[in-house]
């Protein structure tokens, strides 16, 4: 007999987009029924915004390459995580990952990473040339 245990859990916020206007819209009941609605998991829910560190180290910039790009012709969300992982210590045991996506990077854009190691977390900001983040990632070893 198997005991039901969670290996991982996640919380995400999505937008329902009208494909004709490109603008967010309220989903109709038929749209929601396709995915189903369940009770929220009993997990800690963090705020939507990641607190930016006061001090960061600038790391070496790199270009967005073809393998980062998805079918929407911008960097795939999981690629931002892969980029950030390159700057973490090899022995880091990640217990919690939070990602705040700010704007889409496209092929040829330069990524300017910033790193901050604090007592309880590591924050990686993946920024454009004006230091505006494409994505902010927060890694914790303990929840």
Mark where each language-model region is.
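A structural signal for short, well-ordered beta-strand segments
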Residues: 10-14, 60, 97, 101
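A conserved acidic, glycine/proline-rich C-terminal tail/linker
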Residues: 87-118, 123
